[in-house]
Amino acid sequence: MSQPEMPESVTDGDTPEDLLIDATDHPDGLDSELPPTAVDGSYDAGQITVLEGLEAVRKRPGMYIGSTGERGLHHCVYEIVDNSVDEAMAGYCDTIQVELLDDNWCQVTDNGRGIPVKEHPVEHIPTVTLVLTKLHAGGKFGNGGYKVSGGLHGVGSSVVNALAAHFIVEVRRDGYHWRQSFSLGEPDGPLEQLEALGPDDYEGTTVRFQPSDEIFDAIVFDYQTLSNRFREMAFLNKGLRIVLTDRRADHADEDGNPVHEDFLYKEGLKDYVRFLTGTRDVINPTIISLESHRP
């Protein structure tokens, strides 16, 4: 078998030292050998940047939500919904409503416990403000707030806030309705205490946000993308109701009504098997399902 020919620049007798570029052959430096991505200047202590708070999120959003394209845009919705799902898994929420509104707003409402509003004992600001403006501030790092959780584990809400042109949170708990608004992660003002809750009012949290068109490539939510995701969530969390409503004026159905889907699967994965089976004949009509809980 013949041996492959060696490139002209490399011969059998070359040693590693022979392959090194001789700087004397380039008295003006190695500019001719530099890649197109090369930069001018030194790399020393002065080039190290420290980004404070949510500035890092706005500077490199892809590190937190994957991209600034369609996938990252919808990931913001998932992060807010994941917080509500965590409330459901903790046993305090059974309904999540997701609404797509005009002007590229999205609203997520649950009937959970509501984000705490009292002053944080260490940071000395309302806890809801802390959760929405500080990375890694949340109830999922221990201390009994949650046994299990999803999403970015305390990062999600603050990341969405940082990437939103406008972000509004409303909390119903401790006997009152509370409200605070933000712009690109910065509070527009202090947490407001509004009207007292009535005997028929439910507790919970509502988040309404408008993604920044200066950060995302496009800020139009796709209904079908969200529908597919929330159907899967409902299958995985039996008994949890997720309602998706598209209230955008240009997305109404033939009768002019908002497009609407209601996902509720009381048998969870068993219902998922039925969904996959559809109208096809099945060999075994009884779906085998096993479940266990760790202490």
Indicate where each model-derived feature is located.
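GHKL-type ATPase core
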Residues: S2-Q47, D103-T127, G138-K266, D271-Y272
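Alpha-helix capping/hinge segments and adjacent helical runs
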Residues: G53-L54
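Conserved short strand/loop->alpha-helix "switch" segment adjacent to the catalytic nucleotide/phosphoryl-transfer site
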Residues: K59-V77
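Conserved ATP-binding N-box helix of the HATPase_c
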Residues: R71-D94, G156-L163
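A conserved short beta-strand within the histidine kinase catalytic ATPase domain
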Residues: D94-L100
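Short basic (Lys/Arg) and small-residue
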Residues: V131
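Duplex nucleic acid-engaging cores and interfaces of nucleic-acid transaction enzymes
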Residues: Y223, R231-F235, T277-R280, I287-S289
